[in-house]
Amino acid sequence: MSAPEMSKSKPANSHLSTGLDEAKLRAQVIEQSTREPSPTRAQLAVRHRVVLSIVMLVPLLIFIACGGIRVGPRPDGLVLQTALGSGILAAGLAILGVGRGRSMLGRPRSWLLLQVLLTPALLLGWRVLISACYPQMMVEWTDRPGLRCFTLSVILACAPLLGLLWLRRGSDPLYPRLTAAALGAAVGAGAWVLVDLWCPVGYVPHLLLGHVLPLLLLIATSALLGSRVIAVGRGSAPLTGR
């Protein structure tokens, strides 16, 4: 009878040991949290503004280094209309894609999906619509197929995209891929505005290769990174503050 009694006592000892380990771990976590207090929401807001300012300044400096605004053969009215229209669209899409709205869980899934789908369509449609109103503004440039615009679009978007993903790391419990895709669309829209000011070509195949394709790649890349970076439990989750 002693052998069975000994075998029955082993699970009890095992559960007791596990419980002690969990209690010890919990005590260590509580002790560490009290020793290293989390920053306040105001402090977090300041940090976020600093990071955003830096990552937004980088593409502007690159844009200036690459020549800045190049009117070229375009009429001033065309440049002004395309820049204003795409700028307003990019700002609205950024508010929709980057902002969380009233819910701490972020935008509804339908809003994010709509923003991702509409971003390339609206920006391309506006550029083509305005260019078509001016003669000779949609002709082919044989020496400008769109590769330089493609490269510039990607370079301009890198720093803002990485910065936004870092700020939103470990924060989305519902749709991390779609949220990240919306961030990529918002960043790509901002890069589109700068490239529009830099590029005088309105030829549709050029726009598809040099302007639309990098935007689509940014959206796809962001979606792939979403599950690894901004999903809850991935990476280092941002502190909520006090």
Feature locations, PLM:
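Disordered, charged N-terminal biogenesis/targeting segments of membrane/secreted proteins
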Residues: M1-L44
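Selected alpha-helical membrane-embedding segments in polytopic membrane proteins
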Residues: A42-E140
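Non-cytosolic membrane-interface motifs at loop->transmembrane helix junctions
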Residues: P75-T82, W111, M138-F150, L178, ...
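Hydrophobic cores of alpha-helical transmembrane segments in multi-pass inner/ER membrane proteins
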Residues: S86-G99, V154-G163, L215-R228
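Membrane-proximal helix-loop-helix units in multi-pass membrane proteins
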Residues: L124-L178
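Hydrophobic alpha-helical transmembrane segments in multi-pass integral membrane proteins
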Residues: L124-Y134, A189-G202, S227
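Hydrophobic alpha-helical membrane segments
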Residues: L156-A159, L178-D196
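Short, highly charged, low-complexity non-transmembrane loops/tails of multi-pass membrane proteins
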Residues: G233-R242
